[in-house]
Amino acid sequence: MALNVRRLITGHDKNGKAIVKIDEIAAHVREGRPGALAVNIWTTNTNPANNSTEEDAGKVNVGTTMPNGTVFRMIEFKPGVTPRMHRTDSIDYIVVMKGEIDMELDDGVEVHIKEGDLMVQRGTIHNWINRGKASCFLAVILVHADSAVAGGKVLPAHG
């Protein structure tokens, strides 16, 4: 499995009939850091989301998160991916689609996750480390959130 992602996006025709509007292999892959490739499947920039837009929201240029919205992406972490401790202003729903990877927290604690595991990342500083011999593929949905607060201290996005 390379980062070869089929995007299926539904919508409606002018009569309100459900149709498949997009059925393609996503070609807009970007390298976020050496060893980490990502492709956005879909994004939204409002809550509630607009289900009537004609724009291909998977091709919108977006950073890690979308202010007031969501980002659905597939990420490939290759073995030896460059470290990047970071925190986002989002709640991230993560599914390990294939492979395995270690998530490192800011105090050095590591958690090993593997294919089929599910994670909810709630604005914590973390890093992804792939010590294996094969790529790890994560499906990630990022939902914009307020910065995390702990002990009365705001923990803003960084990295």
Question: At which residue positions do the language-model features occur?
Answer:
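N-terminal leader/capping segments at the start of a protein or of a new domain
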Residues: M1-N50
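Conserved short histidine dyad/triad with adjacent acidic residue
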Residues: I25-A27, E54-G58, T70-D89, R122-I125, ...
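Short beta-strand His + acidic residue motifs that chelate non-heme Fe in jelly-roll/DSBH
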Residues: P83-M85, M103-E104, H112, H126-G132
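A short hydrophobic beta-strand segment most commonly corresponding to one strand
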Residues: D92-Y93, L118-N127, K133-A150
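Short acidic-glycine-tyrosine-enriched beta hairpin
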Residues: D107-G123
